[in-house]
Amino acid sequence: MGPTASGKTALAIDMATQYNCEIISVDSALIYRDMNIGSAKPSAEELEMAPHKLIDILDPSESYSAADFRRDALLAIEDIISRGKTPLLVGGTMMYFKALLEGLSPLPSADEAIRQQILAQAQTEGWEALHQELCNIDPVAGERIHPNDPQRLSRALEVYRISGKTMTELTQTKSAALPYDVVQFAIAPNDRKVLHELIAKRFNIMLEQGFIEEVARLKARDDLHLELPSMRCVGYRQCWQYLDNEFDHATMVEKATAATRQLAKRQLTWLRSWPDLQWLESGVEGNLVTLMRQSR
């Protein structure tokens, strides 16, 4: 685990190529095909050296829930173990980790028709009005979910409209926790400034690699828009808005790196309260040895 740009992928590939491990990606951006540069997806050469499960499994027009991830990850874990290898789960989507380790409440599957109804309502009335609707239906969820978080707000309303029960009611029970022993590590720089520098450096590299052109190709499709989970991934939204001439290139870079720093902050907030977690410092020699020694 770890915040974005902390060096998780490089360490995981080192581990997978030197030990009897196979990687399962725990990343809500890497699941999408044709989103390679902005998601910092491992290169074709890296994937050949160390294949990753749960990468490139969806089109950007599709949605994917934590429940979907848990189902697919459990199947991947069983497959890897059956071949005598050790599953190595790597990523920064903390909700996916939480769902896998602790189990999930029995929430209804996504309903695209209802989701589109909610989106249309948001476009006419605004997300603030929908947030007030949620507060009236489910005050606990309304307090927890910010009006500027359309993905979670939409899901809470969708659950209620499908089932007639609130998210709070349905989350009182959970499925069984992960039936395996898990050793958990997090990697991050000790200094926040170093992480911010890594984020800025990586985004500049993405631009050099053709990130704007990647987003332009996605934007040229007639089935993608900014309300989709794929297009809400950090960097993609800001670059899309730049291509729409909402702001200039320098502002796009500033907004994208700021959004990435906010993502890293949220990830670190999760990790600081995560139980049974062992920490590694980014860029330190010997991390792989430490990882293997403490995993035994």
Swiss-Prot record:
It is an enzyme of class 2 (transferase). Its EC number is 2.5.1.75. InterPro entries: Dimethylallyltransferase, IPT, P-loop_NTPase. GO terms for molecular function: ATP binding; tRNA dimethylallyltransferase activity. ATP binds at G2, P3, T4, A5, S6, G7, K8, T9. Its cofactor is Mg(2+). It catalyses: adenosine(37) in tRNA + dimethylallyl diphosphate = N(6)-dimethylallyladenosine(37) in tRNA + diphosphate. The record marks T93, R115 as: Interaction with substrate tRNA. NCBIfam families: miaA. PANTHER family: TRNA DIMETHYLALLYLTRANSFERASE. Monomer. This is tRNA dimethylallyltransferase. It comes from Shewanella frigidimarina (strain NCIMB 400). The lineage of its organism: Bacteria, Pseudomonadati, Pseudomonadota, Gammaproteobacteria, Alteromonadales. The gene is miaA.
